[in-house]
Amino acid sequence: LIDERISLQTMLVDAAGSKNPEYTEVLNLVDHIKYEGLTPGEEYEITGELYETKQLQEGTAEPVARGTVRFKAPASSGEAAVPFSVRTASLEGKEVTAYETISKSGEEVASHTDSHSKAQTIRVAPKPHLPGTADNAYAIPLLLALAGSVLIGCTHVFTAKIRRPL
């Protein structure tokens, strides 16, 4: 049962309110939902599911996180927030999209499921690469510095031998 009088608008952000979260091993997201058309005083449940966007569009998606919020609608229009926590190891550099459904007495009355919605989608930042001691980026400057030191040392020894009195 979908009630056509109910409309939803959503915005998925990180816990700080950003659409561009920094990398973290566990990403805390909040799906902000604006609703219109609910019956004031009635109990509702919003269920949010977070999916990898590409898999959603290919039809092979399983939720990577779920969140549920129960509330009594104070007015026909209002806002609710569904929190998610998701481990980012398999999602680095990928987009995730939130789908929402609103139920009343166990029956779905509204949903918002659009895998192309930028408001419902957020990109999981890749893990930053920290240079290690064995990185090749440091090898060439180190070799050049070593070669320069050897050259200066040899020049000093050679010059010192030439200046010696006989």
What is each of the regions a protein language model found here?
Residues 36-38, 74-76, 85-93:
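Short, surface-exposed loop/turn segments at beta-strand-coil junctions that are enriched for proline
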Residues 132-146:
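Juxtamembrane/start-of-transmembrane alpha-helix segments at the extracytoplasmic/lumenal side
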Residues 9-19, 131-135:
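Short, solvent-exposed loop/edge segments of extracellular or virion-exposed proteins
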Residues 49-56, 85-113:
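Enriched for extracellular/lumenal, surface-exposed ectodomains of secreted and cell-surface proteins
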Residues 20-32:
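Contiguous beta-strand segments within globular domains
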Residues 69-80:
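Short proline/glycine- and polar residue-rich coil/turn motifs
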Residues 1-5, 108-127:
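Short beta-strand elements
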Residues 148-166:
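C-terminal membrane-anchoring or membrane-association module
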